């Protein structure tokens, strides 16, 4: 399986890293991570795979493998539980003091072989009681190193060595009786050591990078500088930078030319002032000479500029009317424009609305052009953009009414022409008859009805209609009568009164739909003809045919056809006719 390299980013203190223990990672998962992902080391592929080392090993394959002696591991028999307590109490604060490790330990300076040789030769000259010990020597050398690092931190560059008087301030904390006697001689030795090491610290320190070329091959240089690859600049960025530089050069050149032109202008002004002053001085001399010699001539030489002659105004041929006075709007004291110059909110909204409409129309046209010559056959096609579309086969129907043509001349009599009606004006002429078409509203004009004729199956002719309003749907009887029986429960004693329309045809339709077989009628009365008197009226017989207690049908008044019917008023209840007892017909004896 091919491995892929993963370039990991630099670690940062702001990035949270997951810490996993050994038991949290399975062996198979660890092997897959180590085999699939290879961390990019930043070196060449040949050096990374060590081809040269593999070639050397293959060449020396016949050589016998030499075993390297390694001491065998031995188990430690130390029992740390006996020396350390089991329960460890954590302190409230881990920081006990702010001193560094170097400040806590003893002197940081360690004697070298040269120091030991110098100290032996120095002590040979002194008595045994006045000799300098190795610890005091290290303490003095350490003070000199610390003071030099504080006073001259860049002594390795400028080769500056602090004086002996500056070093005495660091020797004050030490024992003056033992140290100050040897301070001068130790300072001279320390100064010679610094000069030999090119004024570098005598204590062993880490070697940092000072010069990139000389320190490149030095293996002891620590903390090398990280080489950051510069970002590759594309051609577009180069062109943009070049344009900016050209524009800047042009602007600077224009500014330079303006400054030069202004400088030349000021020089010309200075020359002109000098010439005018010289002319003034010469005229003053001429004036004095004229006064001294008594010359009385014109003073044209003393005048710098002659006044120009003005043309005489021409007489107007015709008196022109004065122009109308201009009406000026009063200026406001605060300097703001007048209300007529201010932009109205309605105008601003109208402009925004017009811009929005133009943008929408442009997008609609772009959408139409984009879908041109394409048919959307997907499961859920896009809805067509609202706009003018062609209705194939549909033609709008335009209603036109033809006026009645005038009577033909041939239909009249062929006799002599009769005088016109204008010759004999009528006293009360009839009002002119005005013809009005079908009322059309704006909606019908915007969407006129259209029709299409097509032939279907079995050569049947179909007429398709568009734009006609659908008829209003009547509510069902249950929905229409639902509100009629919604009575409040406050007045339970009163009988419910239902609102009925006396002119509604639903009741008549319901009664007309009842079959005759289901209606129970009383049997017709039996009339004994022998008891009928000879002069009985048919109306009396009709009245006697009803049983006692049965109501007589009341004749409903029929409205006159010439009169207009009253409008239905559903708010007024209609009282139901109550049955009235009729006298029973008695047989005639």
UniProtKB/Swiss-Prot annotation:
Keywords: Cell cycle, DNA damage, DNA repair, Nucleus, Transcription, Transcription regulation. Residues 298-339, 403-430, 468-497, 516-589 are annotated as: Disordered. The keyword Repeat does not apply. It holds the Pfam family EPL1. It is found in: Nucleus. Residues 474-487 have a biased composition (Basic and acidic residues). Residues 567-589 have a biased composition (Pro residues). Residues 557-566 have a biased composition (Low complexity). One of its GO terms (biological process) is DNA repair. InterPro entries: Enhancer_polycomb, Enhancer_polycomb-like_N. Disulfide bonds: none annotated. GO terms for cellular component: NuA4 histone acetyltransferase complex; nucleus; piccolo histone acetyltransferase complex. Component of the NuA4 histone acetyltransferase complex which is involved in transcriptional activation of selected genes principally by acetylation of nucleosomal histone H4 and H2A. The NuA4 complex is also involved in DNA repair. Involved in gene silencing by neighboring heterochromatin, blockage of the silencing spreading along the chromosome, and required for cell cycle progression through G2/M. Belongs to the enhancer of polycomb family. Component of the NuA4 histone acetyltransferase complex. This is Enhancer of polycomb-like protein 1. The gene is epl-1.
